[in-house]
Design a protein with these regions (language model features):
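Cleavable N-terminal export/targeting peptides
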Residues: 1-32
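Short loop/turn motifs that connect adjacent beta-strands in outer-membrane beta-barrel proteins
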Residues: 24-35, 71-84, 98-100, 115-122, ...
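Sequence/structural signature of outer-membrane beta-barrel proteins
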Residues: 45-51, 74, 91-97, 117, ...
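Residue-level signature of outer-membrane beta-barrel architecture
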Residues: 69-71, 112-114, 156-158, 198
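Mid-length scaffold segments of soluble, non-membrane domains
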Residues: 89-129
Length: 200
């Protein structure tokens, strides 16, 4: 975990150092239809054992590079005023407990960003897609290598410039094979994360 913190701190400091202009406090970033966002987030997965049959304490670091495109102008005229973005994300998880194993997936993604607060922009996101892991057969909750991962969460973006933002947030992850093989109790976890995005 300290290694992830050092990486994110270094990246955030680097983005600040490369900013060549002073960002006015009263200036809002302009995100229009067609604006693309490339981001990288990292966090640490913490297990949830929702039933007595869930016995595995899977946990470990996660890395999530992503690409998105804004597909709407701001909608609404109150606190919920916001924009919709669509895109995709890769996810890599290194499970460090109870065994050192790995998982990798690809998830289409949708995000709704609230724009009423100018540079500070809360958002909600949802993603889901195929996920491969070598946990299969090593824990009672998973019986197949091919699975699906579903993710729902929220976060906050703070725009350092018109094109650079720092992000922090929380996700709930569910990993299972969708009933294609049994047993299929699935894995559930919290994933607090931090990262950055570039817009162009």
């Amino acid at each position: 975990m300290p290694f992830l913190v050092r990486i994110l701190t270094a990246l955030a400091f680097g983005s600040l150092m490369t900013n060549t202009g002073v960002y006015a406090a009263d200036r809002s970033p302009t995100i229009t239809v067609g604006t693309q966002e490339v981001g990288l987030a990292a966090g640490y997965m913490l297990p949830h054992r929702l039933t007595k049959d869930h016995t595995t304490k899977q946990q470990g670091p996660a890395f999530m590079p992503s690409w998105m495109m804004t597909v709407t102008d701001p909608v609404g005229d109150r606190w919920y005023r916001g924009q919709v973005s669509l895109g995709a994300e890769m996810v890599y998880i290194q499970f460090q407990e109870p065994f050192l194993t790995h998982g990798v997936g690809f998830t289409p993604k949708i995000k709704y960003s609230f724009v009423a607060l100018d540079r500070i922009r809360p958002y909600a996101e949802f993603a889901g897609g195929p996920f491969w892991t070598d946990l299969a057969g090593k824990i009672p909750e998973e019986s197949s290598r091919f699975n699906f991962v579903l993710t729902a969460g929220f976060g906050v973006s703070y725009f350092l410039t018109d094109q650079t933002a720092l992000n922090v947030g929380y996700r709930f992850n569910h990993i299972s094979n969708g009933g294609t093989r049994y047993p299929n109790l699935g894995l559930n976890a919290s994933l607090p994360f931090g990262g950055f995005s570039f817009f162009f």
